[in-house]
Amino acid sequence: MSEDSRRVEDDDRGPGAAYQAFLMMEDLLDKLKLLSYEDEVLRKQNMKPLSRHYFALPTNPGEQFYMFCTLAAWLISKAGHHFDQPQEYDDPNATISNILSELRSFGYSVDFPPSRLKAGYGEQVCYVLDCFAEEVLKHIHFSWKRPTYPTEEQDEENVIEDDAELTLNKIEDEIAEEDSDNDQEHFIDLNALSAQTQKLNTKESSKPEEILESNTDAAEWILEVERVLPQLKVTIRTDNKDWRVHVDQMHQHRDGIDTSLKETKGYLDKLHNEVAKALEKVSSREKYINNQLEQLVQEYRSVQAQLSEAKERYQQASGGVTERTRILAEITEELEKVKQEMEEKGSSMTDGAPLVKIKQALTKLKHEIVQMDIRTGVVEHTLLQSTLKEKSNMTRDMHALNIPESSIGAY
């Protein structure tokens, strides 16, 4: 889905959008070289230098993303903002968010999703780094200078020009003027011209039809031109863009390469022979050492096997020890619980507070029993008195009813 959307965006922007990343990457690399990124970043981080299309094409996403974060942090710090150097195990989403926030703080707009930067390549990556590089150049007050073109050295013969010398352009102008003057001075005889053309036609018709070839020798022609040039006082300026000059330079360079190749080939052959001899010596020495150490190697292998067996037995024993250690820990925990319970019960038994409370309760009970006995005695005494009183009243009443009859008669 992302590839389709990217293709739609490229179609909307035009056919050159696919190559925009390459142009931005080349500009970015030039700016990084101006900022000496090779000395300040690559050597400190022990990294390889960037190619012309490093961030424009996908190669290794992890390496490209780490390089992008490293360069972005370095450029932000160089532009005057504090930014910590990202590490390999940092969260990439958090790192990208911090980089985009710094980009917004410089006043640039971010109209693309952060996932484009997570890939480590593309136009957006080049755009972000290019913006940071521009801010660094502004921060250090860098100004672009006008290009200086190399001056072409002219021959001494061409520098000193005489007023009488003519250029080819002047000669052509003069010839054209003379032709025009002749045309104006002399009238043209049409009849004579027609007669001459008829004669020429008859002559040409009489000749056999064949290809006309020039019999002029090129070398003689060049010699004649060189001989006549001083007399004509014509100055021919050499053009550095002439293909003949380039061909001569190519031949010169080729001759130089051939001569250098002959010398270098001898040195390379000698070096090849020395390297081959050294390799033969190394291989023979290696075989000798292997033969000498064969017995020790066998002993080492046997000892290695014994060591592996001992390690296996140790692992088995350590497994049993671990199990027993776990059981011992459980038993120790249970023992601690029992000890704690015994201590709690012992402390409760040796404590005198409950006994004092019991004694106080017994004393209180005895006091209450004494009070109850007293009350019981009082009640019994009261009851006895009331009983005796009733008996006395009853006896008195009985005596009152049994009055003797004699006493009644006397009355």
Curated annotation (Swiss-Prot):
Coiled coil ranges: 161-185, 261-351
GO biological process, one term: apoptotic process
Any single Pfam family the record assigns to this protein: IFT57
Keyword Cytoplasm (UniProt): yes
Cell compartment(s), UniProt: Cytoplasm, Cytoskeleton, Cilium basal body
Highest taxon, organism lineage: Eukaryota
Keywords: Apoptosis, Cell projection, Cilium, Coiled coil, Cytoplasm, Cytoskeleton
GO cellular component: ciliary basal body; cytoplasm; intraciliary transport particle B
Region entry pDED, spans: 317-408
InterPro entries per UniProt: Intra-flagellar_transport_57
Main localisation: cytoplasm
Function: Required for the formation of cilia. May also have pro-apoptotic function.
Family per similarity comment: Belongs to the IFT57 family.
Protein name: Intraflagellar transport protein 57 homolog
